[in-house]
């Protein structure tokens, strides 16, 4: 279900403070975050945010096409390697 338009998009406070600080200094550095549920807002464009996928932080460069999406959409949490040849459980009978 989509978030109500009466509410603002969710962005973690600590992440918002770091973005604002970097925008004021006009610096570019990688921001590490565990907040996968934060929405990408226009002030994040041009920054590189390292998003935690459960094992490591994946650096993602934020572009204008990503605005409105969640950070977690760009860092997959699992790595599917395919079914094995002898795996009869997953085969269709």
From Swiss-Prot:
Keywords: Chloroplast, Plastid, Ribonucleoprotein, Ribosomal protein, RNA-binding, rRNA-binding. Transmembrane segments: none annotated. GO terms for molecular function: rRNA binding; structural constituent of ribosome. GO terms for cellular component: chloroplast; mitochondrial small ribosomal subunit. It is found in: Plastid, Chloroplast. GO terms for biological process: ribosomal small subunit assembly; translation. PROSITE patterns: RIBOSOMAL_S19. NCBIfam families: rpsS_bact (TIGR01050). PANTHER family: RIBOSOMAL PROTEIN S19P FAMILY MEMBER (PTHR11880), SMALL RIBOSOMAL SUBUNIT PROTEIN US19M (PTHR11880:SF8). Protein S19 forms a complex with S13 that binds strongly to the 16S ribosomal RNA. Belongs to the universal ribosomal protein uS19 family. This is Small ribosomal subunit protein uS19c.
